[in-house]
Amino acid sequence: MERLILKKLLNWKNSPYRKPLILKGVRQVGKTWILKEFGKRYYDNTAYFNFDENEEYKQFFETTKDVDRILQNLMLASGQKITPEKTLIIFDEVQDCPKVINSMKYFCENAPQYHIACAGSLLGIALAKPSSFPVGKVNFMQIDPMTFTEFLLANGDENLANYLETVNTIEPIPDAFFNPLYEKLKMYYVTGGMPESVKMWTEARDVDAMQEALSAIIGAYERDFAKHPNISEFPKISMIWKSIPSQLARENKKFIYKVVKEGARAREYEDALQWLVDARLVHKIYRSTAPGLPVAAYDDLSAFKIYLVDVGLLRRLAQLAPTAFGEGNRLFTEFKGALTENFVLQTLITQFEVTPRYWTQTNPPYEVDFLIQRENDIFPVEVKSEANTASRSLKKFKELFPDQVKLRVRFSLDNLKLDDDVLNIPLFMADQTDRLIGLAMEKRLR
């Protein structure tokens, strides 16, 4: 499989400011495979150390802070060779090894000639603890589920992926590309972007195996809930997790605690919800009161929406059968377009530094699905799971904030086009949002 993060890893390798790397990502998103593949492509050899399978490795970090001695002990214990600049050193499953994480300070300061990458499940939880990592002494990188573009590459559709990457004008996509891209996107909604699920489809075309892969991943996540230090939070985390399809099936997708459990209150469940956020199993999107900068200054902390880390996992958790793939556009519109909204949010999270927000108004009701910050501009985004749809909320938003709105963005089943200041992006081009906004802004300035 070709993962686009390999380019970022190569930039890290070649950077004169390189520090030990901590690669974050949910369980089974492909962290270990990526690092091993990176080592195979760009280094003479890879030295791999798994602290879950070989707990004795932890002792080497507990008895000394001397990096040369640590590496000597690791080489003697494992029989692996480590050469400065030539070897990629991978420390895997480090989430329960604070001494290993803290040792990155000494590798950074005293042994920058060694290229070290750390990975582990639930690292977001570990790093949220006080004094759990050396500030300023490590580089962070996030790996998310495979994008639609990566899915196309894995599926052997390099021509379609390459076409999307080379679109450089805001003009309608020819039917020769438009139609097959929508069919492929339907399948991506089914598989999602978890590598094992994608593999079961792209290599074996085995729907049952794909379903089992997604179920196994969900099961692994649910077993992780028990790792919360306060065991009483375990059932609360589980209830929140299982409520997400119901939350997103509502017309108003604002997270409601009573959907989790009748009579539930925020103060009883907010720690459990934060655990899911820190684990990056869910994305928490706050309501914004206005399109101002910095966006965090306008957050309504009492109102937010919750999305799953992956659209395929959401489909499986919601128990939507893969057969919906063949039923016209049903997969796009199923349960209030939740799959489509989750898919778009996934792509925006990976493209923009600032987490998206959303905006609502009551009496009469209007909702802009997302607000995205690109440089110093904020763009309202509406997600439609059908074609030929009106954008009354985008219109209202511009009426209220005319000076702040340079461009409005709509995702739908319609073709690529720019109508005045409304940029319509076909759903299958969501990975190209940042670039397309740039092209649209240039076109409007001409």
Task: Identify the meaning behind each predicted range.
Residues 2-16:
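Pre-Walker A adenine-sensing motif
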Residues 13-21, 28, 37-41, 271-446:
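A cross-kingdom feature that marks ATP-driven nucleic-acid transaction machinery
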Residues 31:
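Conserved lysine of the Walker
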Residues 53-84:
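Short glycine-rich substrate-engagement loop in P-loop NTPases that contacts/grips substrate
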Residues 82-99:
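Conserved P-loop NTPase "ATPase switch" module shared by AAA+ and STAND
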Residues 90, 115-121, 142:
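Structural recognition of the conserved hydrophobic beta-strand(s) that form the central parallel beta-sheet
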Residues 124-140, 152-157:
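Short regulatory helix/loop adjacent to the ATP-binding pocket of P-loop NTPases
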Residues 153-346, 356-363:
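Interdomain hinge/linker elements that couple catalytic modules in large macromolecular machines
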